[in-house]
UniProtKB/Swiss-Prot annotation:
GO molecular function: nickel cation binding; zinc ion binding
Top-level taxon in the UniProt lineage: Bacteria
Binding positions (Ni(2+)): 2
The protein, known as: Hydrogenase maturation factor HypA
Length: 123
């Protein structure tokens, strides 16, 4: 289950970013996950809960945006979404497509956090 190691890396990256920003607690982690990433969503959610235990991300929600598979069709000279990831053929002209544009990413997009500074709680 490589999702657990991905979750550990995600927590480590988010911890570093939160520490740099002086954040005490992260509440939401936004992740972009491509169709072809090979990551099982439910396993990643479970792994995130395990990996975040005892960190400033403990109890944080992992929001996953699924990124569809898009390829570049040289014949049509355009980017097209593939409805079936098993066939890398342009749905418009039927030509084989070799260049993937989106759909492979595992990207930490944003963090949401609680601001515990006295200035933030006073207003």
């Amino acid at each position: 289950m490589h999702e657990l190691s991905i979750a550990h890396s995600l927590v480590e990256i988010a911890e570093e970013a939160a520490a740099k920003a002086g954040v005490a607690r992260v509440t939401v982690v936004h992740l972009r996950l491509g169709t072809l990433s090979g990551v099982v969503r439910d396993a990643l959610l479970f792994g995130f809960d395990v990996a975040s235990a005892g960190t400033r991300l403990e109890g944080a929600r992992l929001e996953i945006e699924e990124v569809p598979l898009q390829v570049y069709c040289e014949t049509c000279d355009t980017v097209v979404a593939l409805p079936d990831v098993r066939y890398f053929r342009c749905p418009q002209c039927g030509a084989a497509c070799r260049r993937i544009v989106t759909g492979q990413e595992i990207e930490l997009a944003a963090l949401e956090y609680e601001d515990d500074t006295p200035e933030a709680t006073a207003s």
